[in-house]
């Protein structure tokens, strides 16, 4: 039986894990919901093309900023001393000036089939790797005990012949 080096098995496991992670990706959604208290919530803050999630203190903007946001309402981030617009559903942009029509469609059959196939392949590679490791471990363990047995019965150095 031809055996594969452990590096190949590890590389295949890493590739399978990466493919699985790419297919089943997750998105972090900020928890600043209009129904929640606006005093303290978690908001998505983007600075220099580096999105981060940070805990910030949020208050309403002063009354002179009423017309600042075109389709939404103004909020003031106290910790950062900056104002932002919380846009109404369907609008985006710094001042909620762009209409953004989102269309949600169910997953296509091809995407579901690809996901199932990749998960199945990942499970096969994982099971194969575990099988390979168990056989390798058993062979190594039996070789050690066989060598120990041969050393004792052959009358190695310093041992009387049996």
Swiss-Prot record:
Induction per the UniProt record: By angiotensin II, endothelin-1 and alpha-thrombin. Strongly induced in ovarian granulosa cells by FSH stimulation.
GO cellular component: extracellular space; plasma membrane
Key words, A-Z: Angiogenesis, Cell membrane, Developmental protein, Differentiation, Disulfide bond, EGF-like domain, Glycoprotein, Growth factor, Membrane, Mitogen, Secreted, Signal, Transmembrane, Transmembrane helix
Signal sequence range: 1-22
Disulphide-bonded residues: 61-74, 69-85, 87-96
Residues that span the membrane, as ranges: 113-133
InterPro entries linked: EGF-like_dom (IPR000742)
Summary of subunit composition and partner proteins: Interacts with EGFR and ERBB4.
Protein name: Proepiregulin
Organism: Rattus norvegicus
Gene: Ereg
């Amino acid at each position: 039986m031809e055996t594969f080096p452990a590096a190949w098995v590890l590389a295949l496991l890493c590739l399978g894990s990466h493919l699985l992670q790419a297919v089943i990706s997750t998105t972090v959604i900020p928890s600043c919901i209009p129904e929640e208290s606006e005093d303290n919530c978690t908001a998505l803050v983007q600075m220099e093309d580096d999105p981060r999630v940070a805990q910030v203190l949020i208050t309403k903007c002063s009354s002179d900023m009423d017309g600042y946001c075109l389709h939404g309402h103004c909020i003031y981030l106290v910790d950062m001393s900056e104002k932002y617009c919380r846009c109404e559903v369907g609008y985006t942009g710094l001042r909620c000036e762009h209409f953004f029509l989102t269309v949600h469609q169910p997953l296509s059959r091809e995407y579901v089939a690809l996901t199932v196939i990749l998960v199945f392949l990942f499970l096969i590679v994982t099971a194969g790797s575990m099988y390979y490791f168990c056989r390798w471990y058993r062979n190594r363990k039996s070789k050690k005990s066989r060598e120990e047995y041969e050393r004792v019965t052959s009358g190695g150095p310093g041992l009387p012949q049996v």
